[in-house]
Amino acid sequence: MPANATRKQIIDTADALFYAQGYAQTSFADIAAAVKISRGNFYYHFKTKDEILDAVIDKRLADREAMLASWDETAEDPAKRIACFIRIVIVNKAKIMAYGCPVGTLTSELAKLDHASKEKANQIMALFRDWLDRQFRELGCGSKSEDHALRVLGWSQGVATLAQAFKNEAYVQREVAEVLEWLNTVAEEVGPRRDA
């Protein structure tokens, strides 16, 4: 396998293991065994677990940037783009019910560990906040945009946490429906109704 392909496989595998097991609970040996490479080959690509973590955070950030960019391209107005973000808890509900939100769980774990990469991981939350803020501004919410963005972001993290704890799909569906209705109300306040 070419070196770049091996490196990518290590990052993808570490990403999945960090999500399912947590960063602290995942060892070099776990990742090497899952990738089926020797430790020597592993060390050729990454000397420390922190180097792998930084690569995983970079991957998650790039993946989320691509997701948001695709919504920017495919959803015709900001309310529909915000609705895409809201519905992500349904789209990913099986994984969320099993492991929680991949962004929220990682930022929380790194904060508890007071890990040097916690600020880098927080960039993903900041990406979501800033993107949502832009969508609400484009919708016409003005000075309320950041508050609305944080409300949606906080809501998504809360639903992900409770979905993981209680494994209740009906709850997730109800919460999504309620926050979409709230979004429609916000959109009505600034212009004609646009069902999200």
Name these PLM-found stretches.
Residues 58-65:
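Short, basic, alpha-helical segments at the C-terminal edge of helix-turn-helix-like DNA-binding modules
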